């Protein structure tokens, strides 16, 4: 409430509320189509290629240095990561004022979204062609997941476009805002190699999120085949 921008309000209103569009077959097809277009125009995509520095000439970023020592030269470099991390990769430069760099670096991070995916029994719940927002109380600004009480502040329920019979739900996504700080203890670990405490927390949050949604949509409980965080 104290820090949300006009952009946040516009995105929430026009994307999450008025424009709850869905893709039959999932959104991976968008990434696949983009990848195909890049290759069609002679482009190359590098995966597992960590960037360690952005090199500048004058007032422009002209090169990307990878961890394996390769240097990629380009007329235009687009960074889609946190601005503070982008500045760290650029390093000291007169182009970015020190006061601005420090201000960006001192801004508090916002929250992330914890997601749970529910596979449903076929032909049990009619397709829900809209987003549903469930709140724990009347104060809609208290939305963060309470890790001490193990309870969501709010949950967004969104049904994926069915792959089979369009009249029935087959997959439901639950999303709830959660602070990023509790996860910092595992920021150095890799997917598939997380400590037991990490997986235990995700399992507990998944169950709490599912329970929260089922309390407000009771018919969901008996239709669950599988849940996954």
Residue ranges and their predicted role:
Residues 226-229:
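Conserved small/polar residues in nucleotide/adenosyl-binding loops
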Residues 167-223:
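C-terminal catalytic lobe of FAD-dependent flavoproteins
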Residues 14-53:
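Helical element adjacent to the flavin cofactor pocket in flavoenzyme catalytic cores
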Residues 1-4:
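Rossmann-like flavin
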Residues 10-17, 190:
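Short glycine/proline-rich turn/loop motifs
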């Amino acid at each position: 409430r104290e820090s949300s921008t006009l952009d946040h309000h516009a995105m929430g209103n026009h994307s999450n509320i008025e424009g709850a569009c869905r893709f039959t077959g999932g959104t991976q097809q968008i990434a696949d189509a983009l990848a195909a277009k890049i290759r069609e125009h002679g482009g190359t995509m590098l995966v597992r290629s960590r960037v360690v520095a952005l090199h500048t000439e004058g007032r422009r970023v002209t090169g990307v240095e990878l961890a394996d020592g390769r240097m990629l030269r380009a007329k235009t470099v687009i960074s889609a990561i946190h601005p503070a991390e982008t500045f760290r990769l650029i390093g000291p430069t007169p182009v970015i004022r020190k006061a601005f760099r420090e201000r960006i670096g001192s801004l508090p991070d916002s929250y992330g979204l914890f997601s749970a995916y529910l596979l449903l029994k076929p032909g049990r719940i009619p397709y829900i062609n809209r987003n549903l927002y469930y709140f724990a109380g009347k104060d809609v600004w208290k939305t963060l997941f309470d890790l001490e009480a193990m309870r969501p502040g709010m949950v967004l329920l969104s049904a994926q476009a069915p792959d089979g019979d369009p009249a029935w739900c087959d997959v439901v996504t639950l999303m709830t805002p959660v602070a990023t700080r509790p996860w910092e203890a595992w920021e150095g670990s890799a997917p598939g190699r997380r400590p037991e405490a990490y997986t235990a927390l995700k399992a507990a949050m998944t169950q709490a999120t599912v329970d929260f949604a089922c309390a407000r949509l009771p018919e969901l409980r008996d239709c669950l085949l599988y849940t996954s965080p």
